[in-house]
Structures are given as structure tokens and as C-alpha cells.
Amino acid sequence: RVRITNTKELIDEIKDMIVYTGYVCDKDIPKHDTKNNHVYVSCGLNKEEVLLIFKQILKVAEKFPDLQFVMTMANSYMEKLSNVKKGNVILTDYIPQLSKKMANCKLLIAYGGYNTTMEILQGECPAIIIPRQNGQKVEQFVRAYAFEPLDVFKVCNPNELRTLPKIIESAIKDESFPKPFKYSMNGVENSAKEILNYVT
């Protein structure tokens, strides 16, 4: 790793060359329109924290019997469980075409990775982000709390999973949630224009 000692000088040198182009996302993602009671829980595989989330989802599901929770779980964990369906919680190792299912679901609960976050914002899908904050995933934590005041999604701190029922209730009862994301989502187009302007 190279440590830059003249950070301020470097920033001053290149600041006029930096152009904000907007966020990059799939523009074909349809706008959300609730058509079922499914709550998709997509919080990664083969990670210790997914077990903590799973245990919390089992408790949460009892409080929301009218919702159908569908949660991804690694095969290695599923083999240890006696059933793949527990009450109104379905476990699966994969949710095919999740980005399309987001368009009609009641709610999405997910980590705050860049692609998932952009799909949520583009489709205006009601969602709860549980941002990872360990290792090199601190960007999820920073982004989630930077966007939270915009009310484009709810945030549940991974260290405060006990608050998840309250957050879910708030998300599904607030008819004005989520708010539209008002910042540019045209990052691809704008980047292409800037590159063409630079090379021509």
C-alpha cells in the first residue's frame, strides 16, 4: 500500500478534472407496484451474520402472519435445518430474477451493496437495508446512512436487529414510502458523454 503524503496538493491539482456523472444503474428496472405479500430477504450466503438475521426473521415473521418471507440461505446451513419452510418463512439457496421480483413484492430486506441499492432506488422498491460494516464493506454502512434521511429506504443497524419489527411496520404502513430518488441515475450516459468530449 502506498501512503500519499501530499493529499491536499493532489486534490487541488485534479479537482478541476473531476466531473460528477451520477449513479449507474439498469434503466430497464420497472417501477414498483405491489402485487403480492412477499418479503424477500437477500442477505448473502456463507456468512456468520446471515444466521443472526435468519434467527431474527423467524421472530419477526410471527409478528407479521400475513406476510410471506422468502430468505436465501447457503446450502451448508440449509442441510442442518429440518425443513425449508418454517411457518411463513421459506428458505432457499437462490431467488431467481430477484430484481424482477422486487417490482411486485411487499418489501425487500437486503445488505447495502451498490448494485442492490441502485436497483432499489431505480425501481423505488420499499426496502430495508442492513448494511455490513466489517472488513471492506464499510462503504455499505456509509452509503446507507447517507441516504437514510432521504427516506428512499429504511436502515436497520446490524447490531440492533431487535428493532427490525418496528422498522418493517413503519415501512409497510407508510403510504408515502419510499420517496422518489431525486439525484441523477444517468451515470452511464453522462460518463460516455464526458469521455467523448475528452477524446474528441
Where are these regions (language model features)?
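A donor-sugar binding/catalytic signature common to diverse glycosyltransferases
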Residues: 97-141
